[in-house]
A protein has these predicted regions:
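Hydrophobic alpha-helical membrane-insertion segments, chiefly the h-region
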Residues: 13-24
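Acidic Gly/Asp/Thr-rich repetitive segments characteristic of extracellular carbohydrate-active
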Residues: 53-84, 89
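Right-handed parallel beta-helix/beta-spiral solenoid domain characteristic of secreted/periplasmic
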Residues: 65-66, 87, 100-143
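All-beta strand scaffolds that present successive hydrophobic residues in beta-strands
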Residues: 85, 102-105, 132-135, 154-158, ...
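Short glycine/acidic-rich loop motifs that flank beta-strands on beta-rich extracellular proteins
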Residues: 90-96, 114, 119-124, 143-149, ...
């Protein structure tokens, strides 16, 4: 093999290896939690991340910034509206008693919208409306429950991180047709996820640990 041929072959091999190595290091951008991203084992965040789900938005989009009230945005919202909560800390309890409300935390550079109960507030998010979506929040230091449903149907609770919070991390009850997926729940005094007196609730791909109980489903049918 002559010297010129050896040099050309070495360049080709090096270029091929560089391209393959570059492809392996490209981190996908999270545009939605629909693809199965989880807090630990899912996609890597990059500098241009937007975790607003890719779903058809029928109504208006209301943006909540740090210093604003999430509850006030819920009160302003009409059925079909999406409330986007920007990264920052919010210390309040949010009640959703309307149908078709999407409450979505925006993830930017790995930072989430964080609801902090400061060890004083009872519950973080309570909903009784139908077709409610809650996703992408970090919830901590509430005395009662992280996300609790009371008779809301067709709900989705996904891609939330709930740590060191009260009695139950995620607690839908008296509901029908719900989805609880890709949440990370830990440090809960009772069950990380508790499904009570509900029908057709799909619980999948959640990470639960360091709680008294993991996933508890009682008096429910699938």
């Amino acid at each position: 093999m002559n010297t010129k041929f050896k040099v050309v072959l070495a360049i080709v091999i090096f270029a091929g290896g560089w391209i393959m190595g570059s492809n392996n290091n490209v981190a996908p951008v999270i545009t939605s939690s629909m693809g199965g991203a989880s807090y630990n084992g899912g996609f890597k965040a990059d500098n241009s991340i937007s975790a607003v789900p890719q779903r058809n938005v029928e109504g208006s989009v209301i943006v909540v910034n740090p210093g604003d009230s999430i509850q006030e945005a819920v009160e302003m919202a009409q059925p079909g509206d999406t409330i986007q909560v920007m990264p920052g800390t919010y210390s309040e309890t949010v009640y959703i008693d309307k149908d078709d409300i999407h409450l979505v935390g925006v993830i930017r550079e790995g930072e989430r919208a964080t609801m902090d109960g400061l060890g004083k507030l009872n519950d973080a998010i309570l909903y009784s409306g139908n077709n409610v979506v809650v996703e992408n929040f970090r919830i901590t230091q509430y005395k009662g429950n992280g996300i609790m449903g009371q008779a809301g149907n067709n709900f989705e609770i996904r891609n939330n991180v709930i740590v060191d919070t009260g009695i139950y991390g995620i607690f839908p009850q008296l509901g029908t047709n719900g989805l609880v997926e890709h949440n990370v729940v830990s440090g809960i005094e009772d069950a990380a996820i508790y499904i009570g007196m509900s029908d057709n609730i799909h619980v999948a791909h959640n990470e639960v640990f360091d709680s008294v109980a993991g996933i508890e489903i009682e008096n429910s049918r699938h």
